Amino acid sequence: ILPLLRGEIVSKKTDWFEVREAQIQLPCYTQPHIEMAVACARSPSGALAAGKHGLGMLSIGGTSDDALTHHANNWKICEETAIANKKHVDRKNWRVVTLAHIADTREQALKNVRFGIEQFARYFREIATFPIVPDNIHNAAEYLMENNMACIGTPDDAIKYIEKLQKGTGGFGAYMELAHNWADWQATKRHYELMSRYVAPHFKGLN
């Protein structure tokens, strides 16, 4: 993909694909190419790929204390791999994905997530291959908060939560949320409004 984005004509044959004189129809507006990031959970494979090609890293797989340790170790692997391949990676291009829902009060936030959090937990237990909430847990919201896997509360709680993520990882460039439909659409829009009005400005030094 990277040679194509650089405008090169690519002919390549592997055991799972073959391209002959392939080229992209539209060149990248962003130079040298569109920004790219490699997903990375617990395994270092994503970190190795990001470092090898000098790309951003997208850390998924939770934000428990144990997960943050894995994320930090994977970033170190990414940096070391980049150096070994004469590439450059930057923490500003490191994204950490988590779960959150905030409201004007903690009580309201907890009430809001009753709309869909248990269905979310059931989906990851019964359909997806990685249960986020164990089968023997009867209160998903409580479990996720107790294990630092989600923030359900107020803007102040979100600020403290993100600061904990920053400390646990050693620092990253972008905070990302999984769109999980825990709350109905009106409450979800209010969550986004509170994040943009109070939480984001805190980290940009604007409030």
How would you describe each model-predicted region?
Residues 1-207:
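Active-site-adjacent structural elements that line small-molecule/cofactor binding pockets in enzymes
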